[in-house]
Amino acid sequence: CKHDHAMTVWHYIKEHDNGITNFHFEVAADLLNEEEMELMKTMRPGLIQLEIGVQSTNLDTIREIHRTMKFEQVAEVVRRINSYGNVHQHLDLIAGLPYEDYESFGKSFDDVYALEPEQLQLGFLKVLKGSYMEERKDDYGLVYKGMPPYEVLYTKWLPYEDTLRLKGIEEMVEVYYNSRQFTNTMEELEKEYDSAFTMYDRLASYYEDNGYNAVQHKRSARYEILLNYIRLHHKEKEDLFREVLTYDYYLRENAKSRPEFAGEDATDKRFVRAFYEDCLLYTSPS
C-alpha cells in the first residue's frame, strides 16, 4: 500500500477542486492510516467517495480467498469516516464464495449493514477464466454461467434456490435502502425483526409471492407495496408506518398533494383550520 502516492493524489484533487467533480476510489479500509483519514475529514462534501470491498465477514471464507482483511478494523474506520459527514461510502459483499452458505452470508450482511454505509452493494461471484476460483471450481462444487460475466449459479454451500433468494434480497436493498427514499421507514421496520437480513428476506419473499418482480413500478408504487406488506405482517402498527412512509415520501418527492397511500388526515385538517381561525382572530381589527 503506497500511502505517499495516495496522499499525493488526494492533496491534488483537493487543491484543484472545481466544486462539481466527484472522484470514486476503491480502498482497503483497514489499510488507511491516520494521516489519510485526517485529510479526508477536510475535503468538500461529495468530493470523494469510497468503495470498500468487504466481500464477507466469514473467517473461513476470508482465509480461503487469501484475504488479510481485519473486519474489526474496517468497521472502526468506516464508523469514523461516517462521523465526518462528507464522504460517501459504498460497501460491497459477494455471494457465492467458498464456505459461505445462506446463513453465513446473512451474518456478513448484518455485520456490514450495521455500519450504515450510503450504499450496500450485493454482488455475485464472477468466475473469470484462469482465475483461482476457476482452478478450484470442482473442489467448491462451483457452477456458473457459461457466458460473460460468468456469474455463479450455485456452490456446494449455496444451492441454486438460495442464490435466487439472494437475488431477491439484492433487489430489495437497491429499492428500499440504496435509493435513500425509505430511510426512516426501514429504520423503524428493522425493529420488528431479529436482523436486517431477515427483514429484507421477508420483503423479497413478499415481492416474489405477489408477482411484483415481473412488473415495472413507479416510485410511488414502491411506497404502496411496502405499506401493504406492513399491513399484512404488522397490522397493529399500520398507522405508525403510514405516517413514517408519508414523511419519507415528502422528504424525497416534490409532492404537491398528499400521496394516495397516506389517506385522508382529519387531524391535520382540524389543526390547520384552528391555526387559520387563530390567525384571523389575531389580525382582526378591535
Show where each model-derived region lies.
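Rossmann-like AdoMet/SAM-dependent catalytic core
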Residues: 159-179, 184-281
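Alpha-helix boundary/capping residues
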Residues: 43-44, 112, 170-173
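A short alpha/beta connector and helix-capping loop motif
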Residues: 105-112
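Conserved small/polar residues in nucleotide/adenosyl-binding loops
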Residues: 282-286
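Conserved SAM/AdoMet-binding glycine-rich loop
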Residues: 1-97
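Flexible glycine/acidic-rich beta-alpha junction loops that bind and position SAM and/or redox cofactors
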Residues: 4-5, 60-65, 97-104, 116-205
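Hydrophobic transmembrane alpha-helix bundles
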Residues: 25-36, 58-70, 91-97, 124-136, ...
